[in-house]
Amino acid sequence: MPSQKSPTKRSPTKRSPQKGGKGAKRGGKAGKRRRGVAVKRRRRRRESYGIYIYKVLKQVHPDTGISSRAMSVMNSFVNDVFERIASEAGRLTTYNRRNTVSSREVQTAVRLLLPGELAKHAVSEGTKAVTKYTTSR
């Protein structure tokens, strides 16, 4: 009869959590201790275009609301368009052997990325915003 090893029960070994590894434990709400007193950790702020999207919505449709899911979609959309315009403007700056992204590059990027009438409206609104900013300074 072949000798079979019976499975031995192993007691779980206590390991100290490693910094940044899988076993690292997350700090609770109490956070760090200073002089024996628990100090609450401040939550990191989440940046969003939510308030601006809401303001524009109220300008266009004052009696309409927006769900948090729809707000999340709109926020993602604005972030995506911003990233596209910024990267295209950066590319144009590199092509023209410049170091600074100016309003001209941003305007050209908008013309390249947005179709027809939408680009015209975006350029006119952008120009209006830049003029308002320069006159207020």
Curated annotation (Swiss-Prot):
Motif SPKK motif 1 in this chain: 6-9
Residues found modified as Phosphoserine: 11, 16
Main location class: nucleus
CDD domains: HFD_H2B
The keyword Hydrolase is annotated on this UniProt entry: no
Record keyword Ribosomal protein present: no
Cross-link Glycyl lysine isopeptide (Lys-Gly) (interchain with G-Cter in ubiquitin) per UniProt, renumbered positions: 132
InterPro entries membership: Histone-fold (IPR009072), Histone_H2A/H2B/H3 (IPR007125), Histone_H2B (IPR000558), HISTONE_H2B_site (IPR055333)
One annotated GO molecular function: protein heterodimerization activity
Pfam families linked to this entry: Histone
Domain of life: Eukaryota
UniProt PTM: Monoubiquitination of Lys-132 gives a specific tag for epigenetic transcriptional activation and is also prerequisite for histone H3 'Lys-4' and 'Lys-79' methylation.
Transmembrane segments: none
Cellular compartment(s): Nucleus; Chromosome
Keywords: Chromosome, DNA-binding, Glycoprotein, Isopeptide bond, Nucleosome core, Nucleus, Phosphoprotein, Ubl conjugation
UniProt name for this protein: Histone H2B.1, sperm
